[in-house]
Structure formats: structure tokens, C-alpha cells
Amino acid sequence: MGVQKTEAEVTSSVSAEKLFKALCLDIDTLLPQVLPGAIKSSETLEGDGGVGTVKLVHLGDASPFKTMKQKVDAIDKESFTYAYSIIDGDILLGFIESINNHFAYVPNADGGCTVKSTITFNTKGDAVVPEENIKFANDQNRAIFQAVEAYLIAN
């Protein structure tokens, strides 16, 4: 299995607690409001929202993909960290075994926060994820972050 990793960091004037809640705990209800083309629906297949929960996400018309199945790997409401894996769906392109996503919301002295993200692509065999797919994943995360951040600032 091949492994490719990408990391990103962005700062926000919104607190770590507020961004963590919006982007990790309330994302299924909030995202369709702030970025309507991103997700059509999300249904819980297993679990209660905690670690081990499996969700089937039907992506919106703005996405070139239709579905993805996500599994919550870790949630820490005190340190504002969240991790989930994409374990199935056309988003895996047939040659990716899984995509692990880890987010840490680090409080800043000014009341805002720094969001650190790591995306790990686990490929089948010797497959390599093309750079444009890695860029697409980072761009999608950035677009979601910016839309939710703007919503939180406005409300």
C-alpha cells in the first residue's frame, strides 16, 4: 500500500471551540445551509456520532463525485481535534484504499485559532494519487472552511 500525505494550516478570527463545533460536530446540518452545492444529504449508517460512527454522504452537484462513506476515527472535544476516514465511494477513484483526515483547532492568544489539517491517502498497491487530486482535496477543505468561517462571523 502506498501512502501520500498533505498538510495545510490556516488561521481564523473565530475561536477554536466555535469552529470545531461547526466544522466537526454540526457539519451535517450546517454545510447544506452555507454551501448548498457541496452535500445533498448525509445519513448515519452506524453509531451515534461518536468514534466508530459510519455515515453515507451524498455529494452535491458542485462535486464531480456522488458518494462517500465516512468513519469517525477520533473526537476530542477538549483539545478540539477530530479525525475521520473516507472508506468507500467513487471519491476513492478505484485506486485509493482510504483517505484519513485529521484536524486540530489550536486556540490563539487573540481569541481566534489556527486550524491544522493532515490528509493521508492510502493507495492500493503502488498507485500514486495525482497532484491535481491532492490539490482538489485541499481546495475542497479550504472552500468548506471559508464558507463556514464566513457564516460564523456573520451570525
UniProtKB/Swiss-Prot annotation:
Domain of life: Eukaryota
Keywords: Allergen, Pathogenesis-related protein, Plant defense
SUPFAM superfamilies tied to this protein: Bet v1-like
Tissues showing expression: Expressed in roots (at protein level). Expressed in roots.
Gene Ontology CC: one annotated term: cytoplasm
Keyword Signal annotated: no
InterPro entries: Bet_v_I/MLP, Bet_v_I_allergen, Plant_def-hormone_signal, START-like_dom_sf
GO BP of this protein: abscisic acid-activated signaling pathway; defense response
GO molecular function: abscisic acid binding; protein phosphatase inhibitor activity; signaling receptor activity
PROSITE patterns (UniProt xref): PATHOGENESIS_BETVI (PS00451)
Thermal activity profile: Melting temperature is 65.3 degrees Celsius. Unfolds at 95 degrees Celsius. Partial refolding after cooling back to 25 degrees Celsius.
Family assignment from sequence similarity: Belongs to the BetVI family.
Subunit structure: Monomer.
Official protein name in the record: Dau c 1 isoallergen Dau c 1.0401
